[in-house]
Amino acid sequence: MLSDAATVAATRGRIMAVDFGDVRTGLAFSDPGRTLATGAGFIKPGGIAKAAEAVAAAAAERGAAAIVVGLPRNMDGTDGARADRCREFAGRVAVLSGLPVMMTDERLTTVAASRFLNATDVRGRERRKVIDSLSAEIILQDTLEKLAGIGRS
């Protein structure tokens, strides 16, 4: 079962973010104080089940207290084409990891990552190696800011 933001905000410690993809799944982790998101590379296992296993293992290895999975939304707020696959993936991660897993809107994260990589002149193979992790990092930093607001309310 997936968790809400209040449940994740109530946990203490490092948060993991995931940008689930069919080819690569980007990963990022926060510091224990939840102020800074840092990209942590990507995984390339095939399919939802293998990706969920790899993410649950990475969360355990890095000591994550909660996991955030990007939810692809259209600009009008409706679910994107991959939303159902991402929900299935997030549900599997929740079961396998035993951690609170929430989904968060990932609109424009890949666009923001692409713009950053364009501005820093990262191209070709190097770009493919970092874009998914950078997208997860953007998802996580946005989530950290939202969770900090919940903690102050």
Indicate where each model-derived feature is located.
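Phosphate- and other anionic-substrate recognition elements at nucleic-acid/protein interfaces
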Residues: 1-18, 23-153
